[in-house]
């Protein structure tokens, strides 16, 4: 018999599975769950079903808290489609046969034709082939291509699910996960929204391995407490634990974001600088100070060169620790109706070019040593904010079909862009670096950019000129 397809009965399978386990002679009636990625997402669904034998869960690297498994926000951060679902689909189904595609039911045929006509998709042969086959064996990527908006009611359903989860949970993710978004955000959103005994762990940039073996010492302490009643002290410790890059040490906190956070705006300024000093009033500056910084990005059909604006602080006089969510307020105009905004935060090391020849025989590298920390994404037409769900440090966008609005070319628009959280100490002599771009390119294998876990994004098929303003009336700034 053939499978009924994706995730048809899983909403009740969890409860039935736990019920079966409790009837076994080797079960004492106390059940826990552990797993990563999809196996983490299923733990949240099981917890919401409320079986009394489920005493605790440990979902690490779960998917988004909004939309369930493969929800819109998982694969469209800020409305920008990325290609991780292509990897999931093709690696799983590349060997399976396809038939000649037939007529799709109802509105699905219309959505398919709209996707086939999308010039942005036509730049990517691998993605376009999925459309020509009408998604056979590649349902996840096909659905992302043909349904480029969040369905109405998804957020309300998620928030109802939050209220149903009452079991203790220990969730988390790693710093690597900002590249494909869903795990990094899922852990934070569940921790923030679910009221139950809880703990949160953010680990470093090294990816968890398969089979999953990292942090099992912590998992055992967790379940010794909740399943065996052993006092391991785990619930006496601070609820938040995170790896601080730069300092390379574990830190703890009482909540997330950390209650002691000093939110600090860093303003974009002339000559590619990033400063805590706000722009001077227009009366004190000349017209030149009101002029924008500009970059023009040609599409992938013309170039693989990624254009960008780059802003850096002066070398820091002392260590600066940045921990938590980040947002960018950007005042900008474009000369087309849409673009992607891709925001990159970097730690740039000391400029060794200031050394004299006496200190070495011209051992000056071609580039400054720098380390990417995190990114943010926003498709310009998806800029509408959900004010009730937004915070200053995490803009929350609507992303529904009725909220999509093309940009008026030449109009200066205020964008609030969510940059995913990080935890890093910028050492004295280093610089905080912000880059603004609109494109990334596929440079690796398996629909990835650079390395396995950095998907690229569907970009504009038009040549777009971007103008970024940073004067007193339009104070573009990064909130750290």
Regions found by a protein language model. Name each.
Residues 1-23, 70-75, 350, 357, ...:
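Cap/lid segment of the alpha/beta-hydrolase catalytic domain
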Residues 25-37:
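Alpha/beta-hydrolase fold nucleophile elbow
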Residues 39-51, 330:
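Short glycine-enriched nucleophile-adjacent loop
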Residues 48-164:
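Accessory cap/linker subdomain of secreted extracellular hydrolases
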Residues 165, 171-173:
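Short beta-strand/loop motif that positions the catalytic acidic residue
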Residues 178-186:
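Conserved alpha/beta-hydrolase "acid-adjacent" motif
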Residues 193, 215-217, 227-480:
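Glycine/threonine-rich phosphate-binding loop and adjacent beta-strand/alpha-helix elements that clamp
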Residues 194-207:
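Catalytic histidine neighborhood in serine/cysteine hydrolases
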């Amino acid at each position: 018999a053939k499978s009924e397809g994706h995730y048809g009965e899983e909403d009740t399978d969890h409860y039935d599975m736990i019920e079966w386990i409790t009837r076994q002679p080797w079960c004492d009636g106390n059940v826990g769950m552990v797993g990563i990625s999809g196996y983490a997402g299923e733990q949240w669904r099981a917890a919401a079903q409320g079986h009394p034998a489920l005493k605790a869960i440990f979902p690490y690297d779960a998917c988004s808290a909004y939309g369930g498994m493969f929800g819109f926000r998982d694969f469209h951060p800020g409305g920008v489609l990325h290609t991780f679902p292509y990897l999931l689909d093709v690696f799983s189904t590349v060997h399976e046969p396809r038939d000649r595609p037939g007529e799709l039911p109802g509105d699905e045929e219309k959505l398919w034709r709209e996707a086939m006509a999308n010039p942005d998709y036509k730049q990517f042969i691998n993605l376009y082939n999925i459309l020509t086959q009408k998604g056979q064996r590649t349902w996840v990527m096909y659905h992302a291509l043909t349904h480029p908006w969040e369905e109405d009611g998804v957020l309300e359903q998620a928030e109802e699910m939050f209220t149903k989860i009452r079991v203790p949970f220990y969730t988390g993710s790693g710093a690597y996960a900002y590249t494909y978004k869903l795990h990094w955000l899922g852990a934070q959103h569940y921790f923030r929204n679910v009221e139950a005994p809880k703990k949160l762990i953010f680990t470093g940039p090294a990816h968890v391995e398969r089979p999953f073996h990292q942090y099992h010492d912590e998992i055992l302490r967790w379940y010794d407490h909740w399943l065996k009643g052993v006092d391991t002290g785990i619930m006496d410790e601070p609820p938040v634990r995170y790896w601080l890059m730069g300092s390379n040490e574990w830190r703890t906190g009482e909540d997330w974001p950390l209650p002691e956070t000093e939110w600090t705006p860093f303003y974009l300024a002339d000559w590619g600088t990033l400063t805590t000093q706000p722009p001077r009033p227009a009366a004190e500056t000349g017209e030149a100070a009101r002029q924008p910084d500009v970059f023009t990005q040609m599409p992938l059909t013309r170039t693989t060169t990624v254009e960008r604006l780059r802003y850096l602080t002066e070398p820091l006089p002392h260590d600066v620790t940045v921990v938590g969510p980040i947002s960018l307020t950007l005042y900008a105009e474009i000369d087309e109706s849409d673009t992607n905004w891709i925001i990159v935060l970097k730690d740039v090391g000391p400029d060794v070019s200031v050394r004299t020849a006496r200190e070495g025989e011209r051992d000056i590298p071609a580039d400054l040593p720098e380390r990417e920390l995190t990114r943010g994404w926003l498709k310009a037409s998806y800029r509408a904010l959900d004010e009730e769900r937004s915070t200053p440090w995490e803009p929350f966008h609507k992303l529904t079909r009725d909220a999509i609005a093309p940009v008026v070319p030449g109009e200066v628009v205020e964008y609030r862009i969510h940059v995913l959280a990080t935890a890093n100490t910028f050492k004295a002599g280093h610089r905080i670096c912000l880059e603004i771009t609109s494109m990334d390119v596929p440079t690796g294998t398996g629909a990835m950019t650079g390395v396995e876990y950095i998907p690229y994004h569907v970009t504009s098929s038009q040549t777009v000129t971007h103008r970024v303003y940073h004067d007193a009336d339009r104070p573009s700034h990064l909130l750290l």
